[in-house]
Design a protein with these regions (language model features):
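Mature extracytoplasmic/luminal segments of secretory-pathway proteins
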Residues: 5-6
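Residues forming the flavin
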Residues: 29-82, 86-177, 181-552
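Short, Lys/Arg-enriched N-terminal segments with co-localized hydrophobic residues
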Residues: 13-28
Length: 552
């Protein structure tokens, strides 16, 4: 009887298989599946088609396309799997709906809103204003995204930094040349998806819609930013490069515009621009913070995180994260990591991890050395780096000056410059030597182009930072065998993790708590922490600026 039942079940299964084959040959359809597969299966569409045909009973000839909707890697155990959500197109090709397109209108003769700063907050504010029928007038202190690249190259050649055109200032902001990571902890899925779709509309790969930790790549992002600017211009908006805001124009407690210096020509000109102001100047615009403090415009000190940029050979991180001496192999991407712990009452964590990337010089002025990281789209260099930073709260710095956290940053950056021979050469130390309070007599080959100089970071950096980093590194080394090693090098100093102040605004209308018509925006105002969250905040500020104009 058991054998007969088994034969009956097999017969039923075979009949259903034949039914599916016949149905597929006769009709068009799409189906979605959640699957967990080996990396080689997820590697390309051909492999996925073969897998789905075998596992789901499809005729391979009828599968026209497989679109990956979501992708994440499960590397918690020795056997690595890729979790996928896929859409299978049977007897039909997908429509041109890989991303949701936003319609932008002509706003040539519409009311103006001044957007100060063309980083992600300013760009997305500007595009949202156009959606809402308003005309953005963008003021960017730096150069366009292509020209600023030339100035960044000069940092390595001349060991000097242009204070208006560098890795922080210029079209696209600090994020334009720091990997283009789009991962966010925001739970607001709708706004996050909108930001990603706008990037796709302007040339980013649609893979960012699927990846759990999406990134565009520092080599691809400039073209996307350029396309976003062209949308602004094509719709009747304005973009003014090398135009730095110097002050707000006030009518009592109402902001009606800004004054700015136009530095595009040999003779600088002072210009005035009128309209409500979205202030999206980024976390490194210290002249703006000083102006706001001097003008008694309400702000508060905000905590940041400070530390170093830590660089390992990428193959070592691959071996650790993928539990395999052969590393990532052919089918896996360069490995990422994320570490967090508590040390002496403060959080210590990895920040802005860049697999297969470079460490870059991110100073914005003379006599300072600052590090950051970036990765190309293929994440293909021989190094992987991350900020390793310690939480610094306002109460950790003496005094009640609103700008005391900023002054702490400035002192550490200046000390780093002094330790680097008063150039952009960065002081550095092998990781295990640092933990054991030993000077590194030599340094490993590293990606930091201006060069490294061996330096006892454990000795001259603030003990508030070094003691906590030493404790945290021991913890991370226990969590990931091989992570704490002298193959890794610490490069000082990582200080620009977020804004050192928060410009106070109303929770409901996002306007400054006292000044009507001023909308502090995104990371520079203390309300975002990365490209996506800055973009979301930019869109929200644009919506509130639109509502404000409707009322006046």
């Amino acid at each position: 009887m058991g054998k007969n039942n088994k034969k009956y079940c097999n017969s039923q299964r075979f009949s259903r298989y034949i039914y599916l084959i016949l149905r597929q040959k006769e009709s068009n359809m799409t189906e979605e599946f959640q699957i967990r597969v080996l990396p080689q299966v997820a590697y390309n569409e051909a492999n996925l088609k073969a897998y789905l045909a075998q596992e789901k009973g499809f005729d391979p000839e009828t599968i026209y396309r497989v679109r990956v909707l979501k992708r994440s890697i499960d590397a918690r155990h020795r056997d690595i799997y890729v979790n996928l959500k896929v859409r299978v197109y049977v007897n039909e090709f997908p429509q041109d709906d890989a991303y949701v397109k936003t319609e932008y209108q002509d706003v040539s003769n519409k009311p103006s809103v001044i957007v100060v700063g063309e980083g992600p907050g300013g760009l997305f504010a500007s595009l949202k204003l156009i959606e809402l029928g308003l005309r953005p007038v963008v003021l960017e202190r730096g150069k366009n995204v292509r020209d600023r690249k030339l100035d960044m190259a000069l940092i390595t050649k001349t060991q000097e930094v242009d204070p208006e055109s560098n890795y922080c200032f210029g079209e696209g902001g600090a994020g334009a040349y720091s990997d283009g990571k789009l991962y966010t902890r925001s739970k607001k899925r709708g706004p996050v998806d909108k930001i990603l779709n706008v990037f796709c509309q302007h040339g980013a790969s649609t893979s960012i819609l699927a990846d759990a930790h999406p990134h565009i790549g520092t080599d691809k992002l400039p073209r996307v930013i350029e396309n976003m600017r062209n949308t602004i211009l094509d719709c009747g908006g304005e973009v003014h490069f090398q135009t730095k805001m110097t002050s707000l124009i006030l009518d009592g407690n109402k902001v009606v515009g800004v004054k700015a210096i136009d530095n595009r020509n040999a003779i600088s000109l002072t210009r005035e621009f009128f309209g409500p102001v979205i202030l999206a100047t980024g976390h490194s615009a210290r002249d703006v913070y000083r102006y706001l403090a001097d003008a008694n415009i309400e702000m508060e000190a905000k905590g940041i995180a400070v530390g170093v940029r830590l660089e390992h050979p990428s193959h070592l991180i691959d071996q650790i994260q993928y539990h395999n001496k052969n590393g990532k192999g052919k089918y896996l991407p360069t490995a990422e990591y994320s570490f967090v712990t508590q040390a002496q009452g403060r959080g210590v964590y990895s920040f802005c991890m860049c697999p297969g990337g470079f460490v870059i010089p991110s100073a914005t002025g003379p006599e300072q050395t600052v590090t950051n990281g970036m990765s190309p789209a293929n994440r293909g260099t021989q190094w992987s780096n991350s900020g390793m930073v310690v939480q610094l709260n306002p109460e950790d710095v003496e005094g009640d000056d609103l700008l005391r956290i900023m002054h702490y940053q400035e002192k550490l950056e200046h000390d780093t410059w002094l330790q680097g021979n008063r150039k952009q050469t960065a002081p550095a130390q092998r990781m295990a030597d640092f933990v054991n309070n030993r000077l590194s007599y030599d340094l490993p080959k590293a990606s930091y182009a201006p060069g490294l100089i061996s330096s006892p970071l454990h000795f001259w950096m603030p003990s508030f930072i070094t003691k906590r980093l030493q404790e945290a590194f021991k913890t991370f080394g226990k969590q990931a065998h091989g992570f704490l090693t002298n193959e890794a090098v610490m490069i000082a100093s990582e200080t620009r993790t977020s804004s050192p102040v928060r410009i106070l605004r109303n929770r409901e209308n996002l306007m400054h708590i006292r000044l009507e018509g001023l909308f502090p925006c995104a990371e520079g105002a203390g309300y975002a922490g990365g490209i996506v969250s800055a973009g979301i905040d930019g869109e929200r500020c644009a919506e509130m600026a639109s509502a404000y104009l409707e009322q006046i």
